[in-house]
Each structure stands twice: as C-alpha cells, then as structure tokens.
Swiss-Prot record:
It comes from Actinobacillus succinogenes (strain ATCC 55618 / DSM 22257 / CCUG 43843 / 130Z). The keyword Flavoprotein does not apply. Residues 67-88 are annotated as: Disordered. It is found in: Cell inner membrane. Belongs to the UPF0161 family. This is Putative membrane protein insertion efficiency factor. Pfam families: YidD (PF01809). It is a peripheral membrane protein. Disulfide bonds: none annotated.
C-alpha cells in the first residue's frame, strides 16, 4: 500500500526526481556519500516529512564537498528524534 504524502512532500519529491532524471545525467556522478544525496533526500522526506526531511537533505548537501571524505551516511530513523529528547 502506497503512503500518502502531503503537498509539500510531493513537490519536493518531484523536484528531486527531476534532478535525478534530467540534471544528474548531464553533470555525472559527483556525490561522495552512500546513499547519494538525492536518494538520501527522497528517503528523508518520505520518512520525516517535508520540513524535517528538507532540513536533513540540506545539511547532507552542505557536507558533500571535496574536503569531506564522504562514506556511508544513512537517513536517521524517525524514532531517533524522540530518543534524543528522552535522554535529556
């Protein structure tokens, strides 16, 4: 069963898919991370919603530069937000 997404989530997902289909093939692979930043963005938005997902994606994109080695950097699980708050 497909999850229903808010309008904001749908717009962000379509923008990322546009990038993946149209822009990324033109510029070639450049991401230093696994999953790629665009795949990370899709997963973050689907998992955390439009606002938090966009924030996580922006932070990830800002880390993707030549001075960062990259590597495996998965989207944090949704329950991670609550566990950090409970530990305070």
């Amino acid at each position: 069963m497909a999850a229903s997404h808010s309008l904001g989530e749908k717009i962000l997902i379509k923008l990322i898919r546009f990038y993946q289909i149209v822009i990324s093939p033109l510029i070639g692979p450049r991401c230093r991370f696994v999953p790629t930043c665009s795949c990370y963005g899709l997963e973050a938005i689907k998992t955390h919603g439009a606002v938090r997902g966009a924030w996580l994606t922006l932070k990830r994109i800002l880390k993707c530069h030549p001075l960062n080695a990259g590597g495996y950097d998965p989207v944090p699980p949704k329950s991670d937000n609550h566990s950090k708050e409970n530990k305070k």
